[in-house]
Amino acid sequence: VRIGQAIGIEKYKKFLNDLDLINSIQFDIEEMGKPIPFNWGKCKLATTSYGHGITTTILQLTSAYSTIANGGFRINPTLIKKEKYVKGERILEENVSSNLVSILRKIVTTKEGTATLANVEGYEVAGKTGTAEKILEGGYSRKKINTFASVFPASNPKYSLVVMLDEPKTNSEYVYNYRDGSGIKYKGTPFNTAGWTSVEVVGQIIEKIG
């Protein structure tokens, strides 16, 4: 929140717009989903600074992570394969892009990270989890939407992969040593946060198509 306050509304709003997270984007086909408009203020600045209070689409989130990971150049998503892609305008300095990818990599590789189930050997996956309570009229539901946005390989990012699961369910005896055998077997109330659901799906996708 303090970082958001230090940046200020106008600069932060411009940054989110530059990443195409809160504005409609140009695409080959019309998107069904679009970000919900909102009014900026001190409270909105505070909540958006830690990931709450805004909506976006999976396509826009994927595009934003691609921009963050590719050295900071804006991505224009397309379904058409081209012989040569023209770089968009620079949104981030290269050193900022590199530092952000390093942080995202630690979320996958460190014990304290929330995305260790995506640590597929040889692919250097980096990314960030998101667990959101579904909105109800006048409040929030206990049901969740889980997201994991990833880029890989971290040393030279080439791919972005985002998985969103709507109201996921988790096996209560899920084996946490899924990757390297060093974890524990959990018994009890199932975890249904992104680290146990969307992250696992991303890891399995990368393993199968890699």
Give each language-model segment a name.
Residues Y85-G88, D180-G210:
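Short, gly/Ser/Thr-rich active-site loops of penicillin-recognizing serine hydrolases
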Residues V1-D180, A194:
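Beta-lactam-recognizing serine transpeptidase/beta-lactamase-like catalytic domain environment
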